[in-house]
Amino acid sequence: IYPRDAEQPMKEEVLLTSPLEYTNEPYAIAKIAGLKMCESFNLQYGTNYIAVMPTNLYGPNDNFDLERSHVLPAMIRKIHLAHCLKEGDWEAVRKDMNQRPVEGINGDSPKADILNILRKYGISETEVTLWGTGTPLREFLWSEEMADASVFVMEHVNFKDTYKEGDKDIRNCHINIGTGKEITIRQLAERIVETVGYQGKLTFDSSKPDGTMRKLTDPSKLHSLGWHHKIEIEEGVRR
């Protein structure tokens, strides 16, 4: 929801200060409309809606679908499958493919078909290929901590706590929920490789797009209200 060229880390007050990322504009506008609706209801009718803006989430029951998943669960699954291939553990490969078929190929498909579809997604016994240079920075929050932060906000925060008393214009009263810490995609992939125990090669295909180079929220407002995250990315990946 924040502007394409917003200063990093992104504070709540940078909302609507410059153009949005063009490819993400409709999605961002829909979210911003929800934030503004809550804010306006509070100001006009005295309601007590609190809007929050989470960073990238990961955790239990994540989406590991190679065709549609986000970066972290996609990397975990790719490296896990490559490790299984490297170890010759076809029982684990077939179990994984039965749980989450890829383009119609499942664990009951012929071995050659499974290997071919995995290669299409950069997965082989000797190598895992990921898109981009690996240099973009991203922030990740354990999903259960998002739930914890949301409950904390509902129980301990009121609308009047989200802006400075005496402000002429009351706006951007939402609260960022994040860690305020970032990691490169390469570092993240290397952590996953280490955790899984994969002994193959990790390759980045720089002919593919990197996406936005940096996305980091500033959670200082939430910190001032009394909530801090506890689970770091290393522990989250192990879980």
Sequence positions of predicted segments:
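Hydrophobic alpha-helix immediately C-terminal to the catalytic Tyr-X-X-X-Lys motif of short-chain
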Residues: 33, 37, 41, 71-75, ...
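Catalytic helix-loop patch of NAD(P)-dependent Rossmann-fold dehydrogenases
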Residues: 1-58, 62-68, 81
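Short, structured secondary-structure boundary patches
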Residues: 14-17, 71-74, 223-225
